[in-house]
Amino acid sequence: MQRSFYEILGIESDASNIEIKRAYRAMLLETHPDKSGLNYNSNGNNTSSHSVTDIQEAYQTLIDQDLRKKYDEELAESFKKLGFHNAGDGLDLFSLDLFDYSGDEQSFSMNCPRCQITDGFQLTEDALEEHAIDYEGGGYFVLVQCSACSLWLKVLFDVMEE
């Protein structure tokens, strides 16, 4: 999954136009070869994670209120298709079924949908048993934070009887 425009500019989804403009200017300076001190490969290409085109597209979309509203709706829909739903309590719901399971380590892992860090969310079977909370819709849930960013998830699961 590619980074959102908010992540490209390094801002929160409720950022004001002033914050968007500041972030845009800062990101352009960060990618400018004479200003940034970033590394360039032998072809003269910037090796940073965002191109000027990405930064400009993010800015142009987020600074226009109509485009931003449409973008936010599309972003929310894309997260829903991935099984990522807002629970209304500020936490996003994910099913444990979407996590990768390692039988050797008896653990579940998933890349963070926000910062894209590999295995940003990790849960062991012991942690699930120890911290499980009854979920009003049936089954259980645990709260878990990404190891690299501030995103918290509510992970839903059922217990399989052996």
From Swiss-Prot:
Molecular function, one GO term: metal ion binding
Claim: Cell division is one of the keywords in the record: no
Pfam families the UniProt entry points to: DnaJ, Zn_ribbon_CSL
J domain residues: 4-75
Keyword list, A-Z: Cytoplasm, Iron, Metal-binding, Nucleus, Zinc
Record localization: Cytoplasm; Nucleus
Purpose of the protein: Required for the first step of diphthamide biosynthesis, the transfer of 3-amino-3-carboxypropyl from S-adenosyl-L-methionine to a histidine residue. Diphthamide is a post-translational modification of histidine which occurs in elongation factor 2.
Domain text: The DPH-type metal-binding (MB) domain can bind either zinc or iron ions.
PANTHER family in the record: CHAPERONE PROTEIN DNAJ 20 CHLOROPLASTIC, J DOMAIN-CONTAINING PROTEIN
Protein name: Diphthamide biosynthesis protein 4
Native source species: Kluyveromyces lactis (strain ATCC 8585 / CBS 2359 / DSM 70799 / NBRC 1267 / NRRL Y-1140 / WM37) (Yeast)
Gene symbol of the encoding locus: DPH4
